UniProtKB/Swiss-Prot annotation:
Subcellular location: Secreted, Extracellular space, Extracellular matrix; Secreted
A Pfam entry, by short name: LRRNT
PTM comment text: The attached glycosaminoglycan chain can be either chondroitin sulfate or dermatan sulfate depending upon the tissue of origin.
Species classification: Eukaryota, Metazoa, Chordata, Craniata, Vertebrata
Protein name according to UniProt: Decorin
Domain of life (superkingdom): Eukaryota
Leader peptide range in chain numbering: 1-16
Transmembrane parts of this sequence: none
LRR repeats: 74-94, 95-118, 119-142, 143-163, 164-187, 188-213, 214-234, 235-258, 259-282, 283-305, 306-335, 336-360
InterPro entries recorded: Leu-rich_rpt (IPR001611), Leu-rich_rpt_typical-subtyp (IPR003591), LRR_dom_sf (IPR032675), LRRNT (IPR000372), SLRP (IPR050333), SLRP_I_decor/aspor/byglycan (IPR016352)
PANTHER family per record: AGAP008170-PA, DECORIN
Gene Ontology CC: extracellular space
Prosegment residue ranges: 17-30
Amino acid sequence: MKATIIFFLVAQVSWAGPFQQKGLFDFMLEDEASGIGPEERFHEVPELEPMGPVCPFRCQCHLRVVQCSDLGLEKVPKDLPPDTALLDLQNNKITEIKDGDFKNLKNLHTLILINNKISKISPGAFAPLVKLERLYLSKNQLKELPEKMPKTLQELRVHENEITKVRKSVFNGLNQMIVVELGTNPLKSSGIENGAFQGMKKLSYIRIADTNITTIPQGLPPSLTELHLDGNKITKVDAASLKGLNNLAKLGLSFNSISAVDNGSLANTPHLRELHLNNNKLVKVPGGLADHKYIQVVYLHNNNISAIGSNDFCPPGYNTKKASYSGVSLFSNPVQYWEIQPSTFRCVYVRAAVQLGNYK
């Protein structure tokens, strides 16, 4: 029985004719022979549904994310999907942001324009972005901050540009702003208007590192918790420069030319937990550290400190409510470490938290 079935299948295969490639003309002849016209054949094909938003040429689109980075683009692509939430245009050759480049992008939350050649942004370019929260413009050629930024903005990063001025009017109405990054710009203290950041009531983080400023910017908002001013040309810290910063928890002033921290200056930052003053020109430990209730980390290495008093870091006695230090760095100072009293670091959490080392 099995042999009979196999024979039958082989016979069927042997009867099958060879495959013949058919062209459009062959199908037309078949239609003519069968009496079916072209219009009747294609009438049976159901109409296609309208296509959704088209992804720009060479870009990649997925789940409201449009990635157009590293494509050598010289301008913003047209016809971006209106539901885009994140638009990545970094590492291109875009030179200008024009009005209408972001039209209809009412759902955009994040715009990445890092590492282009942008030198001009039209005043109304960001107007359609009514939900924008994060704007990244670092590594471009901007000489000024963009005007009329969306009031929903929470994070602005514009480091490594050519910005020389920060006008107070630029930040007007940006009440949701939390982070501002302006480092590595040719900024001078005279280029930052007094109170330029004051109107941003929720501002928590400012970084203006590696610029030419010589003083701490005035009129900083009391909401600030982190202030990073490393790598500048600041020479002094006085009480007025830190006035009103009651919520400041981290202060970065390393790699400046600071020779003195005036008495009472640190009292204006009662919640300070971390202080970076390494790589400066200090000749003594800043006053007021012993009175700070919360400070836990102090970097003072690579200065000119030649003596350390027994009460420079800790209040008198041992039964205090001061937080214990978790890190104190004093290496690379011309201090005679064997002259330091054993009780000097009585409020340090563990002995290993103190870094002394040799002066070179």
